[in-house]
């Protein structure tokens, strides 16, 4: 199967692709190249960097913001800004607190502590942005340029963590609501029933959104993970561990892209020695990931940045784009 044939599209529904791997293997290069190829093929495409390092703007040589920025025809890009995400998430918490005048942020924090194992607010803020894009059908395809493997696996585990946490929060909120009704006559600051109901509805809507994201993420017809590796042992072993973790989260990993493969060079003894070692590692990769489609991208003579260079990489990986 050709690597480009791994991408599946359902009319009216967004396809989601995660591109991940060890730090330094070229995830951003592959993400940007893939996004450009999809856009040239006529797909309305969004590429999102979830990596705080934010090298997507450097790769595309464009200024990219926290909200979708148009890069070329059909192509939009986002670099999630952790500080802005945190501000937006804290604003949501403030709004929840305002639902009940008797419950300030301190009491809201008490609720979070009571729920036990509440996720870190920075991670929850990042996940809040992630949810926003996982539950959209505005684009034909959304490509996630992910952080190094460990951070990505944590993010992908968040639907399960947040679903459990929000479920506990709903339970506690209902208990508080019952107490408020019981003591309302003597404790008027507990807030009215309409405010309580609205706060509960917000939590239930969040839980519904999380469940929708979980359903999409575990659907191989809509979501897939492409692993980027380089032909070195450390990268191979980390990718193998990541593949096993992805199975745990029911995320379909179907492709492996081997980046930075050395070309043949008969006049360079050092290059030939490195190439020989790489060929051994390539054989290892094909054996370990025999159930995946494996593609190779050669090491370039210059830096892999700029739209023209990225389009050439995409053509090596996927062939000429075929506009719809």
Curated annotation (Swiss-Prot):
Belongs to the arsA ATPase family. It comes from the Archaea. Keywords: Arsenical resistance, ATP-binding, Nucleotide-binding, Translocase. SUPFAM superfamilies: P-loop containing nucleoside triphosphate hydrolases. It comes from Methanothermobacter thermautotrophicus (strain ATCC 29096 / DSM 1053 / JCM 10044 / NBRC 100330 / Delta H) (Methanobacterium thermoautotrophicum). NCBIfam families: GET3_arsA_TRC40. Its EC number is 7.3.2.7. The lineage of its organism: Archaea, Methanobacteriati, Methanobacteriota, Methanomada group, Methanobacteria. Signal peptide: none annotated. GO terms for molecular function: ATP binding; ATP hydrolysis activity; ATPase-coupled arsenite transmembrane transporter activity. Transmembrane segments: none annotated. It is an enzyme of class 7 (translocase). The keyword Nucleotide-binding applies. Anion-transporting ATPase. Catalyzes the extrusion of arsenite. ATP binds at residues 21-28. This is Putative arsenical pump-driving ATPase. It catalyses: arsenite(in) + ATP + H2O = arsenite(out) + ADP + phosphate + H(+). InterPro entries: Anion-transp_ATPase-like_dom (IPR025723), ATPase_ArsA/GET3 (IPR016300), P-loop_NTPase (IPR027417).
């Amino acid at each position: 199967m050709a690597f480009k044939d791994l991408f599946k599209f359902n009319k009216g529904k967004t396809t989601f692709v995660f591109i991940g791997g060890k730090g330094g293997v070229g995830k951003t290069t592959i993400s940007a190249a893939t996004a450009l190829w999809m856009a040239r093929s006529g797909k309305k495409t969004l590429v999102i960097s979830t990596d705080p390092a934010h090298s997507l703007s450097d790769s595309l040589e464009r200024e990219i913001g926290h909200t979708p920025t148009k890069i070329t025809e059909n192509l939009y890009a986002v670099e999630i800004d952790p500080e802005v995400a945190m501000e937006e998430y804290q604003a949501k918490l403030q709004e929840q607190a305002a639902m009940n005048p008797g419950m300030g942020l301190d009491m809201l924090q008490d609720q979070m502590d009571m729920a036990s194992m509440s996720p870190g607010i920075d991670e929850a803020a990042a996940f809040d942005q992630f949810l926003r894009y996982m539950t959209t059908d505005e684009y034909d395809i959304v490509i996630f340029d992910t952080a190094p493997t460990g951070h990505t696996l944590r993010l992908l585990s968040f639907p399960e963590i947040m679903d459990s946490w929000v479920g506990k929060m709903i339970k506690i909120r209902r208990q508080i609501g019952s107490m408020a009704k019981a003591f309302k006559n003597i404790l008027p600051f507990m807030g009215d029933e309409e405010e309580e109901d609205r706060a509960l509805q917000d939590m239930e809507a969040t839980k519904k959104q999380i469940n929708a994201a979980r359903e999409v993420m575990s659907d191989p017809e809509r979501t897939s993970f492409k692993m980027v590796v380089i032909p070195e042992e450390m990268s191979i072993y980390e990718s193998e561990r990541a593949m096993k973790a992805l199975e745990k989260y029911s995320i379909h990993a179907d492709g492996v892209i081997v980046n930075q493969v050395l070309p043949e060079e008969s006049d360079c003894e050092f290059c030939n020695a490195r190439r020989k070692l790489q060929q051994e590692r390539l054989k290892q990769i094909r054996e370990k990931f025999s159930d995946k489609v494996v593609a190779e991208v050669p090491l370039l003579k210059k830096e892999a940045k700029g739209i023209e260079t990225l389009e050439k990489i995409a053509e090596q990986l996927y062939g000429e784009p075929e506009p719809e």
